[in-house]
A protein has these predicted regions:
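Hydrophobic core
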Residues: 10-18
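Sec-dependent signal peptide cleavage junction
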Residues: 17-27
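Extracellular polysaccharide-degrading/modifying enzymes targeting complex plant/algal/animal polysaccharides
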Residues: 30, 34-398, 620-635, 651, ...
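Extracellular beta-strand solenoid repeats
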Residues: 78, 85, 91, 105-107, ...
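Predominantly extracellular beta-rich ligand-binding scaffolds that present long acidic/polar faces
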Residues: 87-95, 99-105, 569-706
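Short glycine/acidic-rich loop motifs that flank beta-strands on beta-rich extracellular proteins
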Residues: 88-89, 390-395, 413-420, 436-442, ...
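Right-handed parallel beta-helix
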Residues: 377-387, 400-413, 423-436, 449-466, ...
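Primary recognition of N-terminal secretory signal peptides and signal-anchoring hydrophobic helices
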Residues: 742-895
Length: 895
């Protein structure tokens, strides 16, 4: 129906208010500070005279706090659209804290696009074409004349070019203990002796017109393979003191860190060029696919086609393993490649387009996190994109109630967000992508006393992570601590694992995880391991883990949930696992696998219990020493929560022929293999292995063809497994899609915000008047009359002669008298309004519930101030849909 807005709107602007209601931000209890790239730090920070930098805004908040000028309900720092480059971190501490009643919020103003970056601008016009023959002759590609450019970074104000950071999980490995006589050589010592600092930030990266360029490497895509080996170097894992007594253990006196040497005859023509590459680095999966390591190049012999490293590989090397070489001028041969010469200060670049058309060049030189928060409370970051950082976008330490939401975090060289030693801190409703890692929650909560940290990652999409380190760098890592969570996230596209955890009472739930572990064997999508005592009470439940198959030759393959090396005390329940090799692998004590569905898993088993006792696995020192040191042994909280753990004795651990307390029951395997439970575990009366179905019959899904794995009420699975509990499959993953479906035919709003959703589309109640928003008067919600007409697709008109406003659709006509605000007529029948019309700021407001019900609509109200109006009764349930309501309310909220 065509909407009609007539002279009513002009008439309403002249009416006198009958109820004084405060609607401006300041009058509503909020103080607002404004920041703009076009501002000045000498300005007062008002809307018309904004500040220029985030640091100046922080200082303004400090001034207001000291003078008692913060808002009663909160203080908001509004960033206007643009990019804010940080030469130093935005550091917040205790003096920057808000309170529960009055938090401090840093936000993008009115959904404008705001970016924080840890980079500096390099003048595009400062680049000059390279004509020096001595440089061009170093390049493998002999046709680079007129294509290569360079800029002197020292002349651009860059004081120092840091030595490259060695990428890879094992590049700085602390490999040895202190048993025996002699010095202990560790990998970190070897590379630091060459000037590679393990504590340094990652290498600076180059962005041209907001796109990431790539350090010169060979090959440009894919990998080379180790062809022949002339010196494998030591297997340094055998230097670790956790295998003292083993025949493999190497005593300190015998530890010789010999670099490795291999042949590369297939690329013999290139090797002569590499002789001048004095800053080149080789990356490889030198022995195991999960053990990535970068090593400096030491020597190239073109005659013998031998390549020698400067330090050993952590695990020696073997043939056919993947490697490549990077950080060398000689291999610039593709548009977008660059090389920073640490010695001369020149940045060499092969542009992707005409150099004269380039508008911006940014080099990430900030040696720190973009936002650093220590010992602070009640701070929010909302709607701000953060990235291009050599470390993290956000680093939180010893914080409480710090929340990051609605952010786009990208191109960090470390974890996107680090949360350490904190409580009630969250990352929500955000997109984290093209980062080295996602979110690390470390030591949050009191593990010794089982007090939950309640820090979490929720409703985020995390993809294309581990872009630099490749392995053991996760989308979410719940490390140590107690009681933290990762839920309702969508995680995809990575070479190795998605989620790691250690510690008790962690929850990994309702996540949709796919297309990870793409280039690693013996890897887990959700992985943890090697602890008897510290992980009890953690749960992996109601996740959809699917379509993760490695692109490498594998011995074991990819495992959906991998409880490695006698990890104990974890529950895995209610998961749907599809198109994997193995659904699960475990050993340990008191692990529970129940109520899971496995679909099209290709290995010879879906769940494997791979070892029965610690001695057989050769892990006795590590596991038993860790068990002895566990803090739970002297703590009543642990004794009460986990009596089975408390009952374990050292005699059990050393002499048990089988681990106990395990449950594998009530699982359904469809078009997959069976259950490979080691016989001693299966036969033990102290383990429960039963009611596990293998079937080629559809379990009874609502729509298996379209992967809707919700179970029908009469599903076959309930006949085969009467105790099987329905898995809430439609609640898995991010809220966004489900929320959009839920509100696709509804009007959704929240108190004190000008934003609304109308049939799923976000808009403002009045684009030209931000102050128009739902307000509460005498416990009734009021909204502008004009908005009601527009939102419900009705005609709105005004009769000058009768001074009546009208809202009408095909079935209902409502007439309001502007001379009697307490009455309304519906289809000619006069009715009294319990709450009369109000005039606020020259606009007529109507009681939302009354008018909605007169239009035969249903109104849902949540105590948070969230309101939904639709044709559906009980469109939401405050308890069951609490997280979705919070998500939608956050999308609408001004503060």
């Amino acid at each position: 129906m065509k909407r009609k807005i007539t002279a009513l709107m002009l008439a309403l602007t002249t009416l006198t208010s009958v109820s004084a209601v405060n609607v401006s931000a300041a009058e509503n209890g909020y103080v607002e500070i404004f920041v703009s790239p076009a501002g000045s730090d000498d300005n007062p920070g008002t809307a018309d005279k904004p500040l220029k930098t985030a640091i100046a805004a922080r200082n303004k908040v400090r001034e207001l706090k000291k003078s008692g000028g913060l808002g009663e309900k909160g203080t908001v720092v509004n960033f206007r659209e643009g990019t804010y480059a940080f030469s130093e971190a935005l550091s917040l501490n205790e003096e920057d804290s808000g309170t529960e009643e009055s938090p401090i919020t840093y936000r993008a103003y009115l959904d404008e696009e705001v970016s924080f970056i840890g980079g500096v601008d390099i003048t595009p016009s400062a680049f000059e074409e390279v004509k020096d023959e001595s440089i061009l002759n170093r390049l493998v590609d002999r046709n680079m004349q007129g294509k290569l450019y360079r800029v002197n970074l020292f002349k651009e104000g860059v004081k120092e070019i840091p030595k490259p950071y060695l990428l890879g999980t094992y590049s700085y490995w602390q490999v040895a203990g202190t048993q025996g006589e002699g010095d202990c050589v560790i990998m970190a010592d070897l590379v630091e002796a060459l000037g590679y600092d393990r504590k340094a930030a990652k290498s600076p990266e180059l962005f041209v017109d907001d796109e990431l360029m790539e350090v010169a490497k060979y090959p440009n895509s894919g990998y080379l393979s180790i062809e022949g080996i002339t010196e494998p170097g030591p297997f340094m894992r055998n230097w670790n003191d956790d295998i003292v007594g083993s025949s493999d253990w190497v005593a300190p006196a015998d530890r010789i860190p010999t670099p490795f040497r291999f042949t590369a005859k297939s690329i013999s023509e290139r090797l002569k060029y590499w002789q001048t590459a004095d800053q080149a680095i080789m990356w490889g999966r030198w022995y195991y696919d999960w053990a990535t390591q970068s090593v400096p190049l030491a020597k190239v012999n073109p005659e013998s086609c031998e390549i020698t490293s400067a330090v050993p590989s952590a695990f020696s090397i073997r043939t056919n393993q993947a490697w490549y070489i990077y950080n060398l001028l000689e291999e610039i041969d593709e548009p977008g490649e660059y090389f920073m010469d640490q010695k001369t200060g020149y940045l060499y670049y092969y542009p992707t387009k005409d150099m004269s058309s380039i508008k911006s060049v940014v080099l990430t030189l900030l040696d720190g996190n973009v936002v650093d928060i220590h010992n602070a409370k009640y701070i929010n970051f909302k709607g701000i994109d953060v990235g291009r950082s050599r470390r993290s976008a956000f680093n939180l330490e010893n914080c409480e109630n710090v929340h990051i939401s609605d952010a786009d975090i990208s191109y960090t060289a470390s974890m996107a967000v680090k949360i350490y030693n904190s409580t009630n801190c969250t990352v929500k409703d955000s997109h984290i992508h093209d980062v080295d890692g996602g979110v690390e929650i470390n030591n949050c909560g009191d593990r010794a006393n089982l007090i939950r940290g309640n820090c979490g990652v929720e409703n985020c999409e995390i993809d294309n992570f581990a872009r630099l380190t490749k392995t053991y760098t996760t989308a979410v890592n719940l490390s140590n601590g107690c009681g933290n969570y990762a839920r309702n996230n969508e995680i995809h596209n990575a070479q190795h694992m998605a989620v790691g955890f250690s510690g008790p009472y962690h929850e990994i739930s309702f996540n949709n995880i796919y297309n990870v572990c793409q280039e690693a064997d013996d890897s887990g999508v959700i992985y943890t391991g090697r602890s008897l005592a510290t992980h009890w009470g953690s749960v992996v439940k109601n996740n959809y883990i699917h379509d993760c198959t490695p692109n490498v030759t594998f011995r074991i393959g990819t495992i959906a949930v991998y409880l490695d090396d006698f990890l104990s005390g974890v529950t895995v329940a209610g998961n749907v696992i599809e198109n994997m090799q193995l659904a699960g692998m475990f050993s340990g004590y008191n692990n529970i696998w129940t109520n899971n569905i496995f679909i099209n898993c290709t290995s010879n088993s879906v769940v494997t219990a791979f070892s029965a006792n610690i001695s057989a696995a050769g892990l006795r020192p590590t596991l038993i020493d860790g068990w002895k040191a566990a803090t739970y042994k002297t703590n009543d909280a642990w004794k009460t929560a986990f009596p089975a753990l408390y009952a374990l004795t050292e005699d059990n651990l050393k002499n048990d022929i089988v681990t106990t307390g395990n449950v594998v029951a009530n699982n359904y395997s469809w078009n997959s293999s069976g259950y490979d439970i080691i016989e001693t575990m299966r036969q033990s009366p102290d383990n429960v292995i039963k009611d596990n179905v293998e079937s080629v019959r559809d379990p009874g899904f609502v729509d298996a063809e379209n992967k809707v794995y919700l179970l029908k009420e009469n599903a076959q699975i309930f006949k085969d497994l009467p105790d099987f509990k329905p898995i809430p499959f439609t609640r898995i993953g991010r809220y966004e899609k489900r929320a959009q479906e839920r509100i696709s035919k509804a009007v959704v709003m929240t108190i004190a915000s000008p934003y609304v959703f109308v049939d799923g589309e976000k808009k403002m109640i009045n684009d030209s008047e931000q102050e128009q928003m739902p307000v509460i008067i005498n416990n009734s919600t009021y909204v502008p009359l004009r908005f009601v007409g527009e939102a419900f697709d009705a005609d709105v008109s005004f009769d000058d002669a009768t001074r009546q406003a009208q809202i009408s659709n095909d079935e209902i006509t409502l007439n309001f008298s502007l001379d009697d605000l307490a009455k309304v007529s519906k289809n000619g029948e006069e009715k009294a309004l319990e709450n009369p019309l109000r005039v606020i700021g020259g606009r007529t407001y109507v009681p939302l519930r009354a008018v909605s019900e007169l239009l035969d609509k249903e109104v849902f109200w949540d105590d948070s101030g969230f309101i939904a109006v639709s044709d559906t009764e009980n469109l939401f349930n405050s308890e069951a849909d609490g997280s979705m309501i919070d998500y939608l309310r956050n999308k609408l909220s001004m503060y």
